[in-house]
Amino acid sequence: MKALIVPQEYIRNFSIIAHIDHGKSTLADRLIQECGAVSEREMTAQIMDTMDIEKERGITIKAQSVRLNYPYKGQTYTLNLIDTPGHVDFSYEVSRSLSSCEGALLVVDASQGVEAQTIANVYIAMENNLEILPVINKIDLPAADPLRVAEDIESTIGLDCTDVLQVSAKSGEGIKNLLERIIECIPAPSGDENAPTKALIYDSWFDNYLGALALVRLVNGTLRVGQEVQVMSSGKKYEVLALYYPHPVQKILTQTIGCGEIGIISLGLKSVTEMAVGDTITDSKNPTKVPVEGFRPAKPFVFAGIYPIETDKFEELREALHKLKLNDSALSFEPETSVALGFGFRVGFLGLLHMEVVKERLEREFSLNLIATAPTVVYEVYMTDGSKVLVQNPSELPEVQKIESIYEPYVRASIITPSEYVGNIITLLSNRRGVQEKMEYLNQSRVMLTYALPSNEIVMDFYDKLKSCTKGYASFDYEPIEYRQGDLVRLDIRVAGEIVDALSIIVDKSKSYEKGRALVESMKEIVPRQLFEVAIQASVGNKVIARENIKSMGKNVTAKCYGGDITRKRKLLEKQKEGKKRMKAIGKVELPQEAFLAILKIDG
């Protein structure tokens, strides 16, 4: 299929902003169906969510794009829809999607109202000066209250909702009005088609047949097949081998991509790293002077060790991580070794959901069995000699006498909750060393709390605890703010006298005793009994702060003695005692995988 260049005034680039589960992917399905982009036979639910794991969890992870045509008032308009993820971990996918649009649909569930993540994404859209159209979805639900939600949007975000769009993505009600409103309200792109080529790469992935592909937004000029282009960050030059328009089922081949359009470019590269997200592509003979601005690359926020259970699968794990990295620019990893777990990788993630998704994809797509250690954040450690060390792995924390001070990263957390759960949340946040910044009532029944919290306190099980203390009604979003000095220590776990490096965690000094106590108690339940007594200890430095003993398994060595002399039995029992002593001195204890997960389960 060939496509013609569309004049800029007939192009609309927009994305959909919504909290998880507010019906964003279903709305995208209805828009695609209404525009006739996909035949009835090809249409599947959540057609934009291509990964199995996205469909199973009902979440969008990778931002997808699609080009739609819609006739309106005698003209055919091209609508480029960019679907964005709604979960807090994937907000970098949102920021890069929004940097290539002129408008955004703000989709809010008619029965639930505005959530914390929605507000965070609206602010990103406002920073990019986008036209925001509020849309109230799921109006067919029995609990729908569109008027309350419209007031909610006005009071929380400040958007005018007098003529707000009400739709049902499930039944298709209101979809035609929505498409017409997109054409009328969202501005056309404002690029200069005669200026030098300037294209922003806002996504890239690896195709087994075509190599590395990049999704670009043409800011100025045009792109055509055979043109020699230059990647601005590296200065390297390539020939454009093929150009496509995005389509949910099959890419549409084209010879040129016009100004203001979105398209897929193939330069015949073997690796995505040469087409980094956020980079600018320009013409090599007549380059643009300034690259496209307004894009922030993703920084890893949480680190964890990932190790193969079968130690000979290390190279396969390396290969698998490299393949995932091709499609996930936020993933970072480097090799590391652990005394307890052997060879593995220290992997950087955007958050806990990202970590879960990556681990699940590694296990599912590459058939690997993995152990993940407890997630940690990056600490700044200032040494007595004046130097500064960044610590990602607790076992790398220098000795106490060499440390001047430790700084830990803080986040600003926004939590929106029904007002009856405020007390529970305040208790949870104060237990997690949170500092209240503000608390505001959005309406009679909903409250927004803003807290500064150490990142360390939210990477374990904060989200689960928040959901359980609010019966699942609270929503949560965070952004990194700064490093602050903390009174922190490393808590080590010793099994049979040896430190298990993969179980070390960095904790606030005031909490070290209760965390150590909880850890040794849960480890006692998990570690299998041995033929000798095993001590499980929690220690800070050289000081043991908690201890539990696992009793040895008893073997009846006197079973073969039938009556007779007591000294014979005594001799056998003494011999057994000696053997156990020797075993205790040299015996190794195999730790089951649950032992490494015990850290995640202890209460903060």
Curated annotation (Swiss-Prot):
Positions of GTP binding: 21-26, 137-140
Recorded topology in the membrane: Peripheral membrane protein
Localization per Swiss-Prot or TrEMBL: Cell inner membrane
EC numbers, comma separated: 3.6.5.n1
Keywords assigned: Cell inner membrane, Cell membrane, GTP-binding, Hydrolase, Membrane, Nucleotide-binding, Protein biosynthesis
tr-type G domain location: 9-190
GO biological process, any: positive regulation of translation
GO cellular component: a single term: plasma membrane
Major location category of this protein: membrane
SMART domains named in the record: EFG_C
Alphabetized GO MF terms: GTP binding; GTPase activity; ribosome binding; translation elongation factor activity
Cited InterPro entries: EF-4 (IPR006297), EFG_III/V (IPR035647), EFG_V-like (IPR000640), EFTu-like_2 (IPR004161), G_TR_CS (IPR031157), LepA_C_sf (IPR038363), LepA_CTD (IPR013842), LepA_IV (IPR035654)
Lineage: superkingdom: Bacteria
Catalytic activity, as annotated: GTP + H2O = GDP + phosphate + H(+)
Role description: Required for accurate and efficient protein synthesis under certain stress conditions. May act as a fidelity factor of the translation reaction, by catalyzing a one-codon backward translocation of tRNAs on improperly translocated ribosomes. Back-translocation proceeds from a post-translocation (POST) complex to a pre-translocation (PRE) complex, thus giving elongation factor G a second chance to translocate the tRNAs correctly. Binds to ribosomes in a GTP-dependent manner.
NCBIfam families: lepA, small_GTP
Record-stated family: Belongs to the TRAFAC class translation factor GTPase superfamily. Classic translation factor GTPase family. LepA subfamily.
Protein name listed in UniProt: Elongation factor 4
Upper lineage: Bacteria, Pseudomonadati, Campylobacterota, Epsilonproteobacteria, Campylobacterales
